């Protein structure tokens, strides 16, 4: 398995630290692109390096967290090769992987707890892209 890339801003830092514990327990390698504290910061400073690493194939998938998840999602999705999906419940994570081939999971740090993050990550990591979604003709 490739390294999983992680990024957050200050509002997502605590959940990101929990995600690191979750990944370690499952023996998933990861790279943390920051932030490294709860000090106020700008999410693009950490979203762009994560997006570049996923685009380059250095990390797959990515996990990004900010307060609402919206800002970091918008920044990530400015990158051509990124399909970041904001997921606040497992069903959305499932559909994001199955139908949209999401390569970055985004979670809202201010609106979900660790238990919900567990469920979302389990669903995201256990769902494959359904390739029939791309096998159609117009």
Features from the language model and the residues they span:
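Short active-site oxyanion
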Residues: 3-4, 59-62, 81-83
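C-terminal binding/interaction regions
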Residues: 5-7, 11-12, 90-138
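Glycine-rich phosphate/diphosphate-binding loop of Rossmann-like nucleotide-binding domains
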Residues: 6-25
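A short beta-strand-loop structural module common to alpha/beta enzyme folds
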Residues: 29-40
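Short, structured active-site "lid" loops
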Residues: 46-64, 68
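Mid-chain, well-packed structural core segment of small domains
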Residues: 64-110
